Amino acid sequence: MTMIKIAQQAKQASFELAQFGNVQKNQALFSIADALEQRTEEILVVNAKDIDYAKSQGISEAIIDRLLLTPERIRGIANDVRNVASLADPVGQVIDGGVLDSGLKIERQRVPLGVILTIYEARPNVTIDVASLCLKTGNAVILRGGKETKFTNAILVEVVQSALEQAGLPKLAVQAVTDPDRALLLELLKLDQFIDMVIPRGGAGLHQFCKENSTIPVIVGGIGVCHLYVEASADLERSLNVIANAKTQRPSTCNTLETLLVDKAIADQFLPKLAEHLCKLKVTLHSDDFSEDLQKNPQIQPLEQAKLRQEWLSLDLSVVVVDGIQQAIEHIRTYGSQHSEGILTSNYALARQFVQQVDAAAVYINASTRFTDGAQFGLGAEVAVSTQKLHARGPMGLEALTTYKWVCEGDYLTRK
């Protein structure tokens, strides 16, 4: 099937989907969750094909683990769909409004965006996560996963489409492009007459490719070169726990700490404690600021400047000593990705200065960067984390998958 045909079908499905209310959409979501559990064995057999292919291509164990589905993981994905069904539906919500002096009654109402194209890599759970969030908000979605998940994505979308059909919703509201040919992706990125938003979920290369080639608005995000600045007045013992959480809880995520900035005034006192604490947790520290004795530790390596602009996505941490808060802010402006940045301090005035001067989707005072997440922010599930400023910023929950329209009503009213 051609890309233009898929996009046309998605657009038509979005018109049909917009007519369904919250009850019907929730029924469809519950049907999807049930179908995932009922067809677990079938899904696992197909998933094994993707795992075998990944192993034959020498793909890393970390990526293979992301690809792998188990009965427990499928059950978790199904429960996530049920959780989406339990969330409040933003569609139809009146944001604000009133009656104007002219007598015109005006309301600003939330409505679906229309058609969303999501491009992602080796995460089959994203197929269901994004589909459920789009369906909840009345959007059609085109899913373009990586070649590593080709077979798994195909069966997951087939499960979703069957459940939609049984629930009386348009099954073509969820479609997949399983051919990894990049020329097809280029074609999709030009179909702005049918597709309303592109959400890439992957590395910096994928985001740059979409920005350079798309005529459709692209949500940029998910690249997390996140910093914590240990200011001179910080409680150093408690800071160690926050740093360890931000770095080690789940190193491969975009909200993980990648560079630690330490105030020069406390460096001699704090760096030995930091090394002792994090080396026990198997973290490798990359820095030129540790003492000669500490640098003998094989877990303390020289710092490569180029790494300051990259996500480690592993148990590695850059450590840089800075001369005060202004230098810390300048470092973040130079190397940060506008994702999540934090300060550890007991000085309220410096905390406010940090918040005002650091440009990021989420700014933290005395807390781990790991909280930048839709569920943690109380938004429910998230479709992505945006680091841009237009339309959406930070974790993108259901509201970020809507736009609004002005609804105006008069009594055969004319403008004077």
UniProtKB/Swiss-Prot annotation:
Function: Catalyzes the NADPH-dependent reduction of L-glutamate 5-phosphate into L-glutamate 5-semialdehyde and phosphate. The product spontaneously undergoes cyclization to form 1-pyrroline-5-carboxylate.
HAMAP family, per the entry: ProA
Catalytic activity of the protein: L-glutamate 5-semialdehyde + phosphate + NADP(+) = L-glutamyl 5-phosphate + NADPH + H(+)
InterPro entries: Ald_DH/histidinol_DH, Ald_DH_C, Ald_DH_N, Aldehyde_DH_dom, G-glutamylP_reductase_CS, Glu-5-SA_DH, GPR_dom
EC number(s) reported in the record: 1.2.1.41
GO CC, alphabetical: cytoplasm
Name of the featured protein: Gamma-glutamyl phosphate reductase
GO biological process: L-proline biosynthetic process
Annotated metabolic or biological route of this protein: Amino-acid biosynthesis; L-proline biosynthesis; L-glutamate 5-semialdehyde from L-glutamate: step 2/2
Keywords, sorted A to Z: Amino-acid biosynthesis, Cytoplasm, NADP, Oxidoreductase, Proline biosynthesis
A Pfam family the protein falls into: Aldedh
Enzyme class, UniProt record, top EC level: oxidoreductase
Annotated GO MF terms: glutamate-5-semialdehyde dehydrogenase activity; NADP binding
Family the UniProt entry places it in: Belongs to the gamma-glutamyl phosphate reductase family.
Transmembrane segments: none
Cell compartment(s), UniProt: Cytoplasm
